[in-house]
């Protein structure tokens, strides 16, 4: 599902995990580059957490190989791997201070107290924690502060790879958005390899160098956020990665596609001479005054409008089907609800996915 990298730090070759008759992870091949921020997304039950647990040494593959810098580590215990896992629950010591939590890995290694203290302060600065928090009880920290403590403690292990299991899921939206940017900045500053599991598509798109999409235990597509979003391999990926309009089509000759569930003929870049679906993201649809303003167009009725902060989303009924159109406030629909409208899009803004 991807090209191998010359800077590979982590490789998965046909990795499989079964629990009795249930196949949780099904022959995954993956190559992660050193210093990469790689995120795995997928619906519940897709196998992403089981895959992460195998990488972290908490589960052993039923088949296949996990290689770290070319060395097989399938049976290597988690405490002997140069990796660290940041849990969703954070797993901090609530009865200890911020400094004691961060210093814990260093204390276990026998590092002198003064060296531990200096290192803890260095890590606190890196994760944007005030140095005055060194003696603060973790119990008195906010959710965002505890997240920073957990991250600082993970770096205290000096791991080659940091694994993250949905660490921001329990944090409120505004703070989560701030932490996304900070985590990306920290990744860039340290040059460490990050592997991140999340159900949040926004997190994946904002932070990742590449994204892997899982479904039913399989890694179905790997690519940059731009690739995954604008060039999905199949209909599942297109719909999983965000709102999308899907039109069933069949070939009509002359490079055109004829709508099966909508009237009209459409021109789509890269369309094949076979049945399939035209997929268009809502932001690529626009309101036009005439058919000459776009490669493709459909007439419908605007029947709902939703405010999404800086953007507006419209539902346009075309026959028995509903199209979703998303525009900036500057490009908003100037008419009212239940009024006729012409929705257009260009050939290069749609994707053809064959059946």
Q: Which residues does each predicted region cover?
A:
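Conserved ABC ATPase "signature" region
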Residues: 72-74, 114-132, 139, 184-185
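Non-catalytic connector elements of ABC transporters
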Residues: 244-246, 255-355
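Catalytic Walker B motif of ABC-type/P-loop ATPase nucleotide-binding domains
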Residues: 162-166
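Conserved catalytic motifs of ABC-family nucleotide-binding domains
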Residues: 158
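The feature captures the beta-strand-to-loop junction immediately N-terminal to the Walker
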Residues: 41-43
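Short helical segment in ABC ATPase nucleotide-binding domains corresponding to the A-loop/adjacent helical element
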Residues: 99-107, 117, 121
